Amino acid sequence: MRSCWRDIGLDPNIYVGIVTGAGPAFCAGRDVKFLAQYQAQGKRTPHEDPNDPLFHWGGGGQPQDVNLEKPLIAAINGFAVGVGLNIILQCQLRVMADGAWIGDQHTNVGRLGAPHEMYSALPRTAAAYLTLCNGRLTAQECLQQAIVNKVVPAEQLMAAAEQLAEMICLGSPLAVQAAIRLYRLTASFPPSLSAYARHLDQEIAESEDGAEGARAFKEKRPPAWKLR
């Protein structure tokens, strides 16, 4: 996906992007079973191993990874968890199908994820509910908390997103891109915080509980936490 974000940023004929899922989910996040296979061997996944060529690609490419300065609209067609939720939060405008929901399952599988991004982009109580309780927020709950701009029936989702895109295209591209830069700056946090979050997540991943979380998910059973 990183190449998609880069193409949007470089193409002068693209003013705005719409991000949606191709199936029942907007994005299901990381493959935890894949993670469990690596952890069972005492290894890091390629994206977490500094010695692996794929390490610099991060979690698969998010808009913030290429400093995209064009507006994005999330057309949330289904459930979005983990990295899927992070991508939504990096879209300035969001339209949600009435049957969709968002959630964060990281602590359920012994990981941390990027809660600082949620604390920055969401109402703090909503972010805490998602990150600490592994809770879910329905489309109507997201609308009530101003996490999304609009909730529509699934069959009207893309039309609603395209309507927002058309409104954006009426404005000056230079002014819109400047507004996006300010949007990102006012919602940003110091790089040291992201680095600290990655450090904590990796520390947890290499613990016994980190391996147990992924293993329990793969075996479809409740995890047995050991606090180590």
Identify the meaning behind each predicted range:
Residues P24-A28, K33, V81:
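Short, active-site-adjacent cap segments at secondary-structure transitions
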Residues M1, V19, D31, I88, ...:
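Terminal peptide-recognition signature
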Residues R2-D11, V32-N77, A114-P115, A195:
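An acidic, glycine-rich surface segment that forms the CoA-thioester-binding/catalytic face
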Residues V16-P24:
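Short, glycine-/small-residue-enriched flexible loop/hinge segments at domain edges that mediate gating
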Residues D11-G17, L174-Q177:
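Short beta-strand/loop segment at the start of cytosolic alpha/beta domains
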Residues D52-L54, L130, L182:
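Alpha-helical linker/hinge and terminal dimerization helices associated
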